[in-house]
Design a protein with these regions (language model features):
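A short, Lys/Arg-rich alpha-helix, primarily the initiator
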Residues: 1-27
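Short, charged recognition helix plus adjacent turn
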Residues: 2-9, 70, 78-85
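DNA major-groove recognition helix of helix-turn-helix/homeodomain DNA-binding modules
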Residues: 37, 61-78
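Generic non-transmembrane alpha-helical segments
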Residues: 17, 21, 33, 37-41, ...
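Short alpha-helical elements of helix-turn-helix
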Residues: 16, 32, 48, 62-66
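Short alpha-helical DNA-recognition segment
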Residues: 27-52
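DNA major-groove recognition helix of helix-turn-helix
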Residues: 54, 64, 83
Length: 85
């Protein structure tokens, strides 16, 4: 069965960006804190789901992407930008 993958082979494009943005925030934001903020937006994610998203092991829905953009105070473009080396 074919599964859609990002060029990097991960299940999402936004995971690396979510991790980078979260780690750049001041004060630093933990995965647990981010999960709590997402729950306040009505998105039921726990710390483990955040970890799987950031590592690219889990898909991200458009509803979740919208909430991530709001919680992290960034644009959709910031979350979907593909990193080039």
């Amino acid at each position: 069965m074919y599964k859609n993958k990002a060029k990097s082979g991960t299940n999402n494009i936004s995971g690396n960006n979510i991790a980078r943005i979260r780690k750049e925030m001041y004060p630093k934001v933990s995965q647990r804190f981010l999960a709590d903020k997402m729950q306040l937006e009505g998105i039921e994610l726990d710390k483990n789901a955040i970890q799987r998203i950031e590592s690219g092991a889990r898909f991200v829905t458009d509803i979740e992407l919208k909430a991530f953009a709001k919680v992290l105070d960034v644009s959709y473009e910031d979350l979907l930008a593909e990193q080039t080396l």
